[in-house]
Every structure is written in structure tokens, then in C-alpha cells.
Curated annotation (Swiss-Prot):
It is found in: Cell inner membrane. SUPFAM superfamilies: ATP synthase (F1-ATPase), gamma subunit (SSF52943). Its main location: membrane. Belongs to the ATPase gamma chain family. This is ATP synthase gamma chain. It comes from Paracoccus denitrificans (strain Pd 1222). One of its GO terms (biological process) is proton motive force-driven plasma membrane ATP synthesis. It is a peripheral membrane protein. F-type ATPases have 2 components, CF(1) - the catalytic core - and CF(0) - the membrane proton channel. CF(1) has five subunits: alpha(3), beta(3), gamma(1), delta(1), epsilon(1). CF(0) has three main subunits: a, b and c. InterPro entries: ATP_synth_F1_ATPase_gsu, ATP_synth_F1_gsu, ATP_synth_F1_gsu_CS. Keywords: ATP synthesis, Cell inner membrane, Cell membrane, CF(1), Hydrogen ion transport, Ion transport, Membrane, Transport. GO terms for cellular component: plasma membrane; proton-transporting ATP synthase complex. Produces ATP from ADP in the presence of a proton gradient across the membrane. The gamma chain is believed to be important in regulating ATPase activity and the flow of protons through the CF(0) complex.
């Protein structure tokens, strides 16, 4: 049985921890609002970009002059996995869910005899994947000094992906990130960005237009922007998901700390009561002996 002093110290320690988790919950809630607004504001732009791209690619896809970002290399042998996680922990299963999805995809590709390389964004994903697949890493993007995700950050990542594609390092590139649904729901998502994937419904709706100059000329300019837009949207979705996951995790931690304080306080009171009762019995016994 722990002493009263030990119990009192432990109660104080848990109370201090609860203050920290409560403060982190409030900070995450404030950041979540801004991150959610940014992610939701970017969605219409990304959707419109996809619709424009659909109309252009519907006409250009069958052309011998179709850009490589659309037509691909003609092979499906080398894959680049771009895994986006957070720079900080204490976010529940946010990072592990993305890493799990990326790991499953990696194992599936390797089982098919494909060549896989990994580019990580965020320290936590790098830490988890490098233990097993360190030899597959081509680079790591550090965003620890970035206070607020901007398009410039996405463009830098997209430029590296495009440069590696132009250098013939891979045939297919896929983004792995968490899509923000709500505070308690973040969906691990895999999205292929190279070669471009166009939904049939979007293509049918936009293929009625004629474009000047021709579709291929416009695509040569828009496809790199489309990659950057998709990377930017993924970063924003990931940022909102991270804050939602951290807010939920810290709320649960605060509640658990409160429950532990209640249990420890009950044990402390019972131990204190038992100690007082024992002292009274000793006093009474001593008085009777006299």
C-alpha cells in the first residue's frame, strides 16, 4: 500500500498533467478552426481545377502528343510514395493510420515485384518508416519551422516530385495523407497524382468546350499546377486532421486524468481514515491500560 505522502505526490503530479493536456486541447481547438477553414476554402478551387483538367484530358488522352504527366511513362514498375504526417506527436492515431496505409501499399507493391521509393513530409512518418525501409528513402521534407502551411510549401514539394519524374526516377507517384471529415473523423487517403487520374463523370461534363490553344499546350502548363494544387490540398487536409486528432486525444487524456485523480483521492481518503482510526485505537488501548 502506498504511503499517504506517495499518494499525495501522485495526485499532484496527475493534476499538473491534466493542466498540460487541457491547455494543449484548447490550443488545438484554436488551431483547428483556422486549419479547417483553410482546408474547406481550398476544396472548391481543387474541385474546379479537377473539372477543367477533366475537359482537357478527355480530348488529349488519346493523342500521341499527350503530356507525360497525363500519359505516364508507359510503365508501372517504379512507384514513389509521398507520405505526409505531422512534425509533432500527441495526436492519437493520426500518424500511425497514415503510416499503416502507406506500409500496406508498399508491401503490396513489393509483392508484385515493383520498385518503391519513399519521400516523407513530417518527422513522425519518417521515424516510423525509416526503421523498416530506410534504404527506400529518397528525401525528407522538414516543415517543423513552418507555422502556417502556404502554397509555397506545397509548390516546393511538388517541384521536387516533378523533378524526380523528369529525371526518370519513378513511373507513378501517390500521396498519402489524412482527409479531414470532422473533429473525430480523419480518413487515411491515398491519391495518385502522376500520371494524372481523371474521373469519368468530370471528363464528360467538361469535354463540350473547345480550347485555344490546343488541349496539349494548355495541359503542359496546367498539369504541374495541378500537382502543386493537389499537394497543397493534401497538406491543408492533413493540418486540419492533425489538430482535430490532437484535440480529441488531449480531451480524452484530460478526462482520464480526472478519473485517475478521483480514484487516487478515494484511495488517499480511505488510507488517511484508516490511519486515523488506527491512531484512535492505539490511544484508547493505551488509556485502558492505565
Amino acid at each position: 500500500m502506498p504511503s499517504l505522502k506517495d499518494l499525495k505526490n501522485r495526485i499532484g503530479s496527475v493534476k499538473n498533467t491534466r493542466k498540460i493536456t487541457k491547455a494543449m486541447q484548447m490550443v488545438a481547438a484554436a488551431k483547428l478552426r483556422r486549419a479547417q477553414e483553410a482546408a474547406e476554402a481550398a476544396r472548391p478551387y481543387a474541385d474546379r481545377m479537377a473539372a477543367v483538367m477533366a475537359g482537357l484530358t478527355a480530348a488529349a488522352a488519346g493523342s500521341d502528343m499527350a503530356p507525360r504527366l497525363l500519359a505516364g511513362t508507359g510503365e508501372d514498375r517504379r512507384h514513389l510514395l509521398v507520405v505526409m504526417t505531422s512534425e509533432r506527436g500527441l495526436a492519437g492515431g493520426f500518424n500511425s493510420s497514415i503510416v499503416k496505409l502507406a506500409r500496406l501499399r508498399l508491401q503490396e507493391l513489393q509483392a508484385q515485384g515493383k520498385q518503391v521509393s519513399i519521400l516523407t513530409v513530417g518527422k513522425k512518418g519518417r521515424e516510423q518508416l525509416k526503421r523498416e525501409y530506410g534504404d527506400l528513402f529518397v528525401n525528407h521534407v522538414d516543415l517543423s519551422e513552418v507555422k502556417r502551411i502556404g502554397y509555397d510549401n506545397a509548390r516546393a514539394i511538388a517541384d521536387e516530385i516533378l523533378d524526380r519524374f523528369d529525371n526518370g526516377e519513378f513511373d507513378v507517384a501517390t500521396l498519402f495523407y489524412n482527409r479531414f471529415e470532422s473533429v473525430i473523423s480523419q480518413v487515411p487517403t491515398a491519391r495518385q497524382v502522376i500520371p494524372a487520374v481523371i474521373e469519368e463523370g468530370e471528363a464528360g461534363a467538361s469535354s463540350l468546350y473547345d480550347y485555344e490553344p490546343d488541349e496539349n499546350a494548355i495541359l503542359n502548363d496546367l498539369l504541374p499546377r495541378s500537382v502543386a494544387t493537389q499537394v497543397f490540398a493534401a497538406l491543408l487536409e492533413n493540418a486540419a486532421s492533425e489538430q482535430g486528432a490532437r484535440m480529441t486525444a488531449m480531451d480524452n487524456a484530460t478526462r482520464n486524468a480526472g478519473d485517475m485523480i478521483d480514484r487516487l483521492t478515494t484511495v488517499y481518503n480511505r488510507s488517511r481514515q484508516a490511519a486515523i482510526t488506527k491512531e484512535l485505537i492505539e490511544i484508547i488501548s493505551g488509556a485502558e491500560a492505565l
